[in-house]
């Protein structure tokens, strides 16, 4: 057995699989059981009680994490003229129009987020097969199809994340780094949880959040009590809070 496997087994042994941890306790345990030797990411995953095959049960949105993700996103902006210049001034990493669209269609993917002005969406729409499966396709609902490219770039650079339920009814995204303090991670988790609850489809029946877990880049998943939606910065029993 490799040293890495032994470390992961030892980390997993610290987790009570019969328990649902309070968010603060889960964050602490996730950091404690991380076996990476670098500043790994902290991720959260939710299993939702929705059927993503039905349009009225799709869960998709954005949230501005109060403490960011710990990673500065590389932002690509499809724009021309003054808006292209404004995007560059705002800190966009890649800016262009027709030529850039052609590069992306041929496989260029050195970016983490995409913004487009409305006038270019007729052309950008052809990139659906490339950007769609990667969750990068610009969309008015998430603020990434907009004439205000400066606002969009600033929000993404400032820690705005986008999430979308996958075909297995899962949501997963980064909420920070293992170097973040516990409070920062819990507050980021809380901001994301609030938005996910706000977006609950009216057509969804039964329990909305079925499961939730926090994990690090190299570490086990820590099951979270997803019913815990307030007083997140305590480890007390919710019934006693």
From Swiss-Prot:
It comes from the Bacteria. The gene is rplA. PANTHER family: 54S RIBOSOMAL PROTEIN L1, MITOCHONDRIAL, LARGE RIBOSOMAL SUBUNIT PROTEIN UL1M. HAMAP family: Ribosomal_uL1_B. Binds directly to 23S rRNA. The L1 stalk is quite mobile in the ribosome, and is involved in E site tRNA release. The keyword Disulfide bond does not apply. One of its GO terms (cellular component) is large ribosomal subunit. GO terms for molecular function: rRNA binding; structural constituent of ribosome; tRNA binding. The keyword Ribonucleoprotein applies. This is Large ribosomal subunit protein uL1.
